[in-house]
Amino acid sequence: MRNSFLFTSESVSEGHPDKVADQISDSIVDLFLAKDPEARVACETLTTTQLVVLAGEIRCKGVFEDGEWAPGALDEIEATVRRTVREIGYEQAGFHWNRFRFENNLHGQSPQIAQGVDEGAGKDEGAGDQGIMFGYASDETPDFMPATLDYSHKILERMASDRKAGIAPFLEPDAKSQVTLRYANERPVEATAIVVSTQHAPGYYFHNGEGDEAKYTELRKYVLGVIADVLPAELLTANTVYHINPTGRFEIGGPDGDAGLTGRKIIVDTYGGASPHGGGAFSGKDPTKVDRSAAYITRYLAKNIVAAGLARRCTIQLSYAIGVAEPLSIYVDLHGTGTVDEGRIEAVLPQLVRLTPKGIRTHLGLNKPIYRQTAAYGHFGRQADGDAFPWERTDLVDKLKAALAV
């Protein structure tokens, strides 16, 4: 790796239209898993001005069976969608949780897909689709995440918390952040540029002589304070450039400003561009879908490898075929930072964790309603707490060391 370089990652807030769609989709996943831990869900969401549309396939005992909805199920789905939007904070003329039109186009899962995936006599549960999945970890932050993405997430998470608490009442739900860091010897040494664009209450802008300079100064001062709280002080220098709402006025936002779709922020969801991505989104999918569960187990394995001191950086790839239980390939890359041969680690991992779809779900406890909270501010680098974010645990460290005799 080069000795000195710049690297950038971005994040988007829970009020970004694509993230609104992700959170709605995962709220539906949680709704069905709470009723049937073996539910099959593939829920896509479209959001736009005063409209939310669901589409996809499901199978859920007691909710949708034999092509029929259970009494009250459709009302519960709509209530879940509206509650999710309300919790995000949308009560605007162009997008209001209690006034948008709602369309539910969910229907039954294809029996031809089900026959390849379901367990049967003498047959293990197969992968729900073919594909490649990547996991990554780095020791550059306590969360074992790329610092550029870690800080981008935390800036927006703090702003959302302050908005909901009334500390920053001039903020509205839609926002984006971007952090550029200079690295030396693979360590972040300086923030060269930070971008924050946030939707705001009327009047809180000043651009090309238009707007209210005092209100914009208040907003800018607040955002700079959040940045100073999130980033380590030694990274912020006299040369750091700040772009706070650089286009000026940002009053129309969220689904009223741009249409949102599930699965369009997969780099924000994962590693901010620091790692390869297999291309499959997570939100709206139950954990039998390896796009989701295999991405979680690869993060878990990579994080435990780095936490065990076996490497400073680790990338893992798994691949699957639809209807086939075992992965087709396992690949480990320690980026020249490892203390153990990568081939040895590749051989050991399947001995420690069964990497079939069912094995992954069992090891991590994924058949639970834990997904809405993953759908904003990143699926990785979060705090494992009870059932939440189990792929962030580091409980495999000792077993890895023992298996590799280190």
UniProtKB/Swiss-Prot annotation:
Residues at which K(+) binds: E44
Role: Catalyzes the formation of S-adenosylmethionine (AdoMet) from methionine and ATP. The overall synthetic reaction is composed of two sequential steps, AdoMet formation and the subsequent tripolyphosphate hydrolysis which occurs prior to release of AdoMet from the enzyme.
Pathway annotation: Amino-acid biosynthesis; S-adenosyl-L-methionine biosynthesis; S-adenosyl-L-methionine from L-methionine: step 1/1
Binding site for ATP: H16, D174, A175, K176, R249, F250, D258, R264, K265, A281, K285
GO process terms (BP): one-carbon metabolic process; S-adenosylmethionine biosynthetic process
Pfam assignment, any one: S-AdoMet_synt_M
InterPro entries per record: ADOMET_SYNTHASE_CS (IPR022631), S-AdoMet_synt_C (IPR022630), S-AdoMet_synt_central (IPR022629), S-AdoMet_synt_N (IPR022628), S-AdoMet_synthetase (IPR002133), S-AdoMet_synthetase_sfam (IPR022636)
Subcellular location, principal: cytoplasm
Gene designation per UniProt: metK
Coiled coil: none
Keywords for this protein: ATP-binding, Cytoplasm, Magnesium, Metal-binding, Nucleotide-binding, One-carbon metabolism, Potassium, Transferase
Organism (species): Sphingopyxis alaskensis (strain DSM 13593 / LMG 18877 / RB2256) (Sphingomonas alaskensis)
Subunit and partners: Homotetramer; dimer of dimers.
Top enzyme class: transferase
Family, per entry: Belongs to the AdoMet synthase family.
Binding site for Mg(2+): D18
Keyword check for Metal-binding: yes
EC number in record: 2.5.1.6
Cofactor list: Mg(2+); K(+)
Region of interest (Flexible loop), residue spans: 109-119
CC per GO annotation: cytoplasm
Cofactor note: Binds 2 divalent ions per subunit.
Binding site for L-methionine: E57, Q109, D258, K289
Compartments (UniProt record): Cytoplasm
GO MF annotations, alphabetized: ATP binding; magnesium ion binding; methionine adenosyltransferase activity
The keyword Secreted is annotated on this UniProt entry: no
Record-given protein name: S-adenosylmethionine synthase
Catalyzed reactions: L-methionine + ATP + H2O = S-adenosyl-L-methionine + phosphate + diphosphate
Lineage: Bacteria, Pseudomonadati, Pseudomonadota, Alphaproteobacteria, Sphingomonadales
